[in-house]
């Protein structure tokens, strides 16, 4: 649904303003989205581009669906994910791209817990090198 709405220039323009102002309400923020590093905050000090193999993503999504009592085949889920990726990469407004200064992280073999731990370590090192302080770690 979000991927289809993101194709609308009018919708994106409204969201961009909101998203750019959101971190100003706190002392920084961690934002997640397919155009956060390319459109919303192209000058962010740290950017990650997290990816995973399509089949791995489909299996993970299947597990999420099963937890809420929904049943879909891995093949059907993979087809939907592939369609979403293609749509997001090729849309005219805010396409999904990996910025040259982003740290690419393939999470095909790792868990979310490991990803979170490694990203926090990278952020802490970067902030320390910039003389900045992390206020709240979760």
Locate each region found by the language model:
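RNA pseudouridine synthases
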Residues: 1, 37-40
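Conserved catalytic network of the ASCE P-loop NTPase/AAA+ motor domain
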Residues: 21-24, 39-42, 94-98
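Short, well-ordered beta-strand core segments
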Residues: 29, 45-49, 102-104
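A short beta-strand-to-loop transition that corresponds to the Sensor-1 phosphate-sensing loop
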Residues: 33-35, 52
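C-terminal extensions
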Residues: 41-65
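NTP-dependent small-molecule kinase module
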Residues: 62-68, 87-138
